[in-house]
Amino acid sequence: MNDVFLKALPVLQKLTTAGFEAYFVGGSVRDYLLNRTISDVDIATSAFPEEVKEIFQTSYDTGIAHGTVTVRENNEFYEVTTFRTEGTYEDFRRPSEVTFIRSLEEDLKRRDFTMNAIAMDEHFALHDPFSGQLAIQNKEIKAVGKASERFHEDALRMMRAVRFLSQLDFELDKETEKALESQIELLQHTSVERMTVEWIKMMKGKAAKRAIELLLKVKMETYLPGLKDEKPALSEFASWDWEKRTTEESIWLGLVVAVKPNNVNAFLKAWKLPNKTIQLVNKAYQDALKMKETWLTDELYHAGKAVFSLVNELNVIRGQENNQHKLSQAYEALPIHSKKDLAITGADLLKWSGESAGPWVKETLDKVECGVLSNEINNEKIQIKRWLGYHEE
């Protein structure tokens, strides 16, 4: 049995010893059945939150309104959630009310897909009322109950379906795909932040190309930031070899290269990306657009390692030769990597000249920077001083 389950097993045992039901549920059980890496486990129980807190010495109310208590066991923290049913969904994400119950099957009934509605008890026996194992065997993403109801409860589940297709290389069953297509407009009620997370996970999957093809088939791009009417660009984007991707930034650089938005900054901001990512992708955009492979010395210098590495990564994704080693060698061979590496400062110029500060200081440092980069002069203080025409004291 997987070590992650074995380590968490005492949590289940404490709950069952106290007279309650307790199970591993959700993604960890699915991934166990698929022989995928399991990072953490979710635990569901018939014990109500206050009952859970009585059983464990250390606990935290991390989501008690929805039945979740975090408990500590063997110096590890585990989320334990009470079986529950949910009322109507008023904002296509959150239920209007949550009712704690004692029935495992009723709890599993509210979950999104059958492969995520399998429970495992303390003896590692599986409880699978919705045939999730069969769906996994058939490599099928199938909604629990009516797909239209599951998507109406939380519209993000539509993106999750496409993401799982990419990650697992599965297919959507006919009813689920039909509901996805007919209810796709519900996605407009989903926050950008949540969609961005799903987009990144989708692009990291092994079947990203098929996922994008499905996304376009159901017109999901209409509700994604900056992608309305961009079907041709996304088709091109999907054709690249994304299994060669090594960074998240390459996903965003590839997207702007394919879409060519008028304002790259605004396009990326619409996805609520970190400023650091936006700045890097923005800086790399023009070089990536040109599919630059050969870099002059000053181009390498002004781009910096992060930019030329990102451009090279996208070039590889688009089928070009990997020049990373050659570019890195050329970059490391540069005499300086930023103006801060110069052997002189503005203070030196003021001291040598005896003049007041002014624009001339920056202009002179720029001149020295160019001279050092072109190997016209060595980056040594005395040589630079002579080169500028100042006499030695």
From Swiss-Prot:
UniProt keyword annotations, A-Z: ATP-binding, Magnesium, Metal-binding, Nucleotide-binding, Nucleotidyltransferase, RNA repair, RNA-binding, Transferase, tRNA processing
Protein known as: CCA-adding enzyme
Subunit note: Homodimer.
Keyword set includes Nucleotide-binding: yes
Similarity annotation: Belongs to the tRNA nucleotidyltransferase/poly(A) polymerase family. Bacterial CCA-adding enzyme type 3 subfamily.
Tree of life domain: Bacteria
Essential cofactor(s): Mg(2+)
Gene: cca
Biological processes annotated in GO: RNA repair; tRNA 3'-terminal CCA addition
Enzyme Commission (EC) number: 2.7.7.72
UniProt catalytic activity: a tRNA precursor + 2 CTP + ATP = a tRNA with a 3' CCA end + 3 diphosphate; a tRNA with a 3' CCA end + 2 CTP + ATP = a tRNA with a 3' CCACCA end + 3 diphosphate
InterPro entries noted in UniProt: Bact_CCA-adding_enz_type3_sf (IPR050264), CCA-adding_enz_C (IPR032810), CCA-adding_enz_firmicutes (IPR023068), NT_sf (IPR043519), PolA_pol_head_dom (IPR002646), PolyA_RNA-bd (IPR032828)
Organism for this UniProt entry: Listeria monocytogenes serotype 4a (strain HCC23)
Known role: Catalyzes the addition and repair of the essential 3'-terminal CCA sequence in tRNAs without using a nucleic acid template. Adds these three nucleotides in the order of C, C, and A to the tRNA nucleotide-73, using CTP and ATP as substrates and producing inorganic pyrophosphate. tRNA 3'-terminal CCA addition is required both for tRNA processing and repair. Also involved in tRNA surveillance by mediating tandem CCA addition to generate a CCACCA at the 3' terminus of unstable tRNAs. While stable tRNAs receive only 3'-terminal CCA, unstable tRNAs are marked with CCACCA and rapidly degraded.
Residues annotated to bind ATP: G27, R30, R111, D154, R157, R160, R163
PANTHER family in UniProt: CCA TRNA NUCLEOTIDYLTRANSFERASE 1, MITOCHONDRIAL
Misc: A single active site specifically recognizes both ATP and CTP and is responsible for their addition.
One MF annotation (Gene Ontology) recorded for this entry: ATP binding
Binding site for Mg(2+): D40, D42
Binding site for CTP: G27, R30, R111, D154, R157, R160, R163
